Amino acid sequence: MNHGDRSFSNFYVDLRNYLRIHKNIVFASKLYVGSFMGKNPQSYLVGGMDNWLFNKFHQPPTNRPEISPVRNPSGIENSNILFAEFMDLRGFDYDEIRGRNVITFSNELRIPLFAYLTRGNITSNFIRNFQLVGFYDIGSAWNDAAPWERINDQNTEVINTEGSPFVITLNNFNNPWLQSYGAGLRTVLMNYYVKFDVARPIRNYEAEELKFYVTLGFNF
């Protein structure tokens, strides 16, 4: 875009590696680092999965509303939602954390069960594409202070009440990194590549309840 005060640019690095473990068993990795710049930088929204059926968006506490391009209760002009980047991170809802900068790292061990065990040709799409997957994801997003800094955007909260001369800065000691691990199935069903994942999210060093995903399309 190039419209004065609404202009922005986006720089990112997307690195992927596929390591063959044995025959067609593969260990896949993806590192994504991105940054929005300019007079009107957009946001990376971290959490969820691409093409997630029955999806959910993160709902912050009512006493701590968070500015986000996907929440617009006042009905003001919100064209920025068109340029927000959704970043996959299993175990969490869409827009769990957000920022102008992002880093995510995903690992998958992919085992095509029937193709691995069978020497002959497999004619069934369902059986030929059937995969077992184990995964681990980690990521964070920020505006100013990066997650590897002692004081960062995720563990520091600034409260500025309208009409008050005081500004309160709180350190909530939150871990700026969201993590998850789990397992999943992949196959082709009715000509669609379908994924089913079960993820255990880790927030602030504590494991939370399992989260289930049904998604369409390849991951990476």
Which residues does each predicted region cover?
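Short Gly/Pro-enriched loop/turn and capping motifs at secondary-structure junctions
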Residues: 114, 138-143, 190-192, 201-203
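C-terminal outer-membrane beta-barrel translocator/porin domains of Gram-negative envelope proteins
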Residues: 1-120, 126, 142, 156
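Solvent-exposed loop/turn segments connecting transmembrane beta-strands
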Residues: 1-7, 97-101, 175, 201-212
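Transmembrane beta-strands of outer-membrane beta-barrel proteins
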Residues: 27-31, 105, 130-134, 183, ...
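Subset of outer-membrane beta-barrel
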Residues: 179, 183-188, 196-199, 203
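Short amphipathic alpha-helical segments
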Residues: 102, 176-184, 191, 211
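Outer-membrane beta-barrel "beta-signal"
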Residues: 187-189, 209-220
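Outer-membrane beta-barrel transmembrane domain signature
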Residues: 131-181
